Curated annotation (Swiss-Prot):
This is Chaperone protein DnaJ. The lineage of its organism: Bacteria, Pseudomonadati, Pseudomonadota, Alphaproteobacteria, Rickettsiales. One of its GO terms (molecular function) is heat shock protein binding. It comes from Wolbachia sp. subsp. Drosophila simulans (strain wRi). Homodimer. It comes from the Bacteria. Its main location: cytoplasm.
């Protein structure tokens, strides 16, 4: 470290009081502290210099020696990185324990509690018929599973890791600069607090490996689009004995050519003959469960009319009840190209009858108007 004048470093005069020295140091320490200037070597060097200056000038004996003999007279000067001294108390007075806290805090052993694995998502496509009856759906996916060789310990022969000797299991290294405590990640165990001496060859010490998982998922009847099914413990494997995450299966129902769904109700469109719409009758349709049902068509049914079939829709979740089926009739117009000569003659006769009826109604209407 360069031998710069301590008073110049703290930007105070030689007759400065201890309070002035403390105030000056506080300002400069905050300005150049490594936590506020990560990766800035120049700021870190400056911080060391002002800390060394304060360590001498804040002590009456060291200051007297420095004033008489210079740097050589400042016995017990700045020691670089050393154990925490009484300066931690001054640090707490200044900053309330900020910047990683003072050295007075005990070095706790890093928690060895396992880390839970991540939850996973799986998108499953099923048919409307599958949703109606419920199914057991086989699925497969690739994820991190617990290594079966080391049983998740990461060590060869399932030997558990040992405590890091450098950080004593805390995963952090604390060093003292003046009365500032600087805490960094342990470079021996990389913050883990423990070391695997002989890593498992199969998983490389991670305790997990990539593998394909094949399971069967129970999809309940009546399940709706976008619903999710949770399978506990089938997500990503945890580490250090942590539990596995969960698997969430999201259901997507494939478009159906006949039925449209609205919650538990089903809707479909059925073409009917013009004569059936006029005279009424019955039509046979096939429901979602494959059963044939008869639907009554009232006389004079117009195109677009919806006919309700009670409890012929989808089942409700966790219930024996079912929704309804709505049949929308589409009255087909007759195509002359597909009619026989006799059918055309009958239609013409019907047209003449209708025209005569309309004519009589019109004459009756206008005669009433004239009388008025």
């Amino acid at each position: 470290m360069s031998k710069k004048d301590y008073y110049d470093l703290l930007e105070v005069g030689r007759n400065a009081s201890i309070d002035e020295i403390k105030k000056a140091y506080k300002k400069l320490a905050l300005k150049y502290h490594p936590d506020r200037n990560p990766g800035n070597q120049e700021a870190e060097e400056k911080f060391k210099e002002v800390t060394a200056a304060y360590e001498v000038l804040s002590d009456s004996e060291k200051r007297a020696g420095y004033d008489r003999y210079g740097h050589e007279g400042a016995s017990g000067g700045f020691q670089g990185f050393s154990s925490a001294g009484d300066f931690s108390d001054i640090f707490n007075d200044f900053f309330g324990g900020g910047f990683g806290g003072g050295a007075s805090r005990s070095r706790a052993k890093r928690s060895t509690t396992g880390v839970s694995g991540a939850d996973l998502r799986y998108d499953l496509e099923i048919t409307l018929e599958d949703a109606f009856k419920g199914i057991q759906a086989p699925i497969h996916y690739v994820t991190n599973v617990k290594c079966d060789t080391c049983q998740g310990t990461g060590g060869e022969g399932a030997i558990k890791p040992v405590q890091c000797h450098t950080c004593q299991g805390s995963g952090r290294i604390r060093t003292q600069q003046g009365f500032f405590t600087i805490e960094r990640t342990c470079t021996t165990c990389y913050g883990e607090g423990e070391i695997i001496q002989n890593k498992c060859k199969k998983c490389g010490g991670s305790g997990r490996r990539r593998d394909e998982v094949n399971i069967s998922v129970s999809i309940p009847k009546g399940i709706e689009e976008g619903a999710k099914v949770r399978i506990s413990g089938k997500g990503e494997a945890g580490t250090k004995g942590g539990k596995s995450g969960d698997l969430y299966v999201y259901v997507k129902i494939i478009f159906h050519k006949i039925f449209a769904r609205n919650k538990a109700d089903l809707h479909c469109k059925v073409p009917i003959r013009m004569t059936l719409a006029v005279l009424g009758g019955e039509i046979d349709i096939q429901s979602i469960d494959g059963a044939k049902i008869k639907v009554k068509v009232p006389e004079g049914t117009q195109t677009g009319t919806k006919l309700r079939c009670r409890e012929k829709g989808m089942p409700y979740m966790n219930s024996h009840a079912r929704g309804d089926l709505y049949v929308q009739v589409i009255v087909e117009t007759l195509n002359p190209k597909n009619l026989t000569k006799k059918q055309i003659e009958l239609l013409k006769a019907l047209e003449e009858e209708e025209n005569a009826s309309v004519q009589q109604q019109s004459e009756g209407f206008f005669s009433k108007v004239k009388k008025k």
